[in-house]
């Protein structure tokens, strides 16, 4: 069964949207197999988003992602990577389809409420970043 990582970002946690977002995944038939609340340090945010290190938004992104608690989750289901990305909507909420998380809940392109892996390889890497094998056992 396919797995992906989704993160409820600090802006959504601060606005008490965890339940709203989780319900959207569950209503879509997606199983949440692991979930935790944590606060990334600046160094952890930089490591997680290292792929964007040369991009102009890297500093702001890592500052934002280390600004408050977030909720990484492992989602599981058939075609869950694509399904998750459809439920999240486009990165820029102005371009996101109506009814998606970002269209309904995001503040702006940076504070867009959720992150989702974009491919099986990145999903595996991102899951391993947040969850140990012990946490995934069972």
Curated annotation (Swiss-Prot):
<feature type="binding site">
    <location>
        <position position="9"/>
    </location>
    <ligand>
        <name>ATP</name>
    </ligand>
</feature>
<protein>
    <recommendedName>
        <fullName>Nucleoside diphosphate kinase</fullName>
        <ecNumber>2.7.4.6</ecNumber>
    </recommendedName>
</protein>
<keyword id="KW-0479">Metal-binding</keyword>
<keyword id="KW-0963">Cytoplasm</keyword>
<comment type="similarity">
    <text>Belongs to the NDK family.</text>
</comment>
<keyword id="KW-0597">Phosphoprotein</keyword>
<dbReference type="GO" id="GO:0046872">
    <property type="term" value="F:metal ion binding"/>
</dbReference>
<dbReference type="InterPro" id="IPR036850">
    <property type="entry name" value="NDK-like_dom_sf"/>
</dbReference>
<dbReference type="GO" id="GO:0004550">
    <property type="term" value="F:nucleoside diphosphate kinase activity"/>
</dbReference>
<feature type="binding site">
    <location>
        <position position="57"/>
    </location>
    <ligand>
        <name>ATP</name>
    </ligand>
</feature>
<feature type="binding site">
    <location>
        <position position="91"/>
    </location>
    <ligand>
        <name>ATP</name>
    </ligand>
</feature>
<keyword id="KW-0546">Nucleotide metabolism</keyword>
<keyword id="KW-0808">Transferase</keyword>
<dbReference type="GO" id="GO:0006183">
    <property type="term" value="P:GTP biosynthetic process"/>
</dbReference>
<dbReference type="Pfam" id="PF00334">
    <property type="entry name" value="NDK"/>
</dbReference>
<feature type="binding site">
    <location>
        <position position="112"/>
    </location>
    <ligand>
        <name>ATP</name>
    </ligand>
</feature>
<feature type="active site" description="Pros-phosphohistidine intermediate">
    <location>
        <position position="115"/>
    </location>
</feature>
<dbReference type="GO" id="GO:0006228">
    <property type="term" value="P:UTP biosynthetic process"/>
</dbReference>
<dbReference type="InterPro" id="IPR023005">
    <property type="entry name" value="Nucleoside_diP_kinase_AS"/>
</dbReference>
<dbReference type="GO" id="GO:0005737">
    <property type="term" value="C:cytoplasm"/>
</dbReference>
<feature type="binding site">
    <location>
        <position position="85"/>
    </location>
    <ligand>
        <name>ATP</name>
    </ligand>
</feature>
<dbReference type="InterPro" id="IPR034907">
    <property type="entry name" value="NDK-like_dom"/>
</dbReference>
<keyword id="KW-0067">ATP-binding</keyword>
<dbReference type="InterPro" id="IPR001564">
    <property type="entry name" value="Nucleoside_diP_kinase"/>
</dbReference>
<feature type="binding site">
    <location>
        <position position="102"/>
    </location>
    <ligand>
        <name>ATP</name>
    </ligand>
</feature>
<keyword id="KW-0547">Nucleotide-binding</keyword>
<keyword id="KW-0460">Magnesium</keyword>
<comment type="subunit">
    <text>Homotetramer.</text>
</comment>
<dbReference type="GO" id="GO:0005524">
    <property type="term" value="F:ATP binding"/>
</dbReference>
<dbReference type="GO" id="GO:0006241">
    <property type="term" value="P:CTP biosynthetic process"/>
</dbReference>
<keyword id="KW-0418">Kinase</keyword>
<comment type="function">
    <text>Major role in the synthesis of nucleoside triphosphates other than ATP. The ATP gamma phosphate is transferred to the NDP beta phosphate via a ping-pong mechanism, using a phosphorylated active-site intermediate.</text>
</comment>
């Amino acid at each position: 069964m396919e797995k992906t990582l989704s993160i409820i970002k600090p802006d959504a946690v601060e606005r008490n949207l965890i339940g709203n977002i989780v319900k959207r995944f569950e209503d879509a038939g997606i199983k949440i197999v692991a979930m935790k609340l944590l606060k990334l340090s600046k160094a952890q945010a930089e490591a997680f988003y290292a792929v964007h290190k040369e991009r102009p938004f890297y500093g702001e992104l890592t500052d934002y992602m280390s600004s408050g608690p977030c909720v990484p989750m492992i989602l599981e289901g058939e075609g869950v990577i694509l399904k998750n990305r459809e439920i999240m909507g486009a990165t820029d909420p102005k371009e996101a389809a109506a009814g998606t998380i970002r269209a309904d809940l995001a503040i702006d392109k940076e504070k867009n409420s959720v992150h989702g892996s974009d491919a099986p390889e990145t999903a595996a890497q991102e899951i391993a970043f947040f969850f140990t094998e012990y946490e995934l056992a069972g």
